[in-house]
Amino acid sequence: VADMLVARGVVSREELAGRADPAPSPLAEKALKAPQVAGVLARGGPADRPSDIAAIFAPGDAVVTRKQPENTIVPGGHTRLPAYAAGAKGRVLRLHGTHVLPDSNAHDLGEAPEPLYAVAFPASELWAHPEHPRDEVVLDLWQSYLEAP
């Protein structure tokens, strides 16, 4: 994280080492006041983008997540596919449109937008002995995480 902050100019190596008197950061002007935080978080960050990748699933479709919950672009890299949902069967609730793929974007490899779906999984599909077997867990998952059963 420190290397990323230095590379992006947020802090210097001297500041991290405690040897420099930090100059006022241009980010300080963007700092939210306490009353603003809830409203900003409720709006979220805009991550929807245009994409040439067509949605291949529709609401009601059965899907299965990839068996390996790993980043297929960067070995050992960031992914939003939870390990507990790897290989699980679910159904598409809705298509959110196309959004930035974190597996690529988190590693400065571009936004690589692709379709993002809300997928419902029965609790019994995710855990061997769920407290309430008829409960559902809904995950927002990118198209590259999903396959047809």
Residue ranges, per PLM feature:
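A sequence-level detector of short, solvent-exposed, charge-rich linear segments
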Residues: 20, 24, 35, 111-114
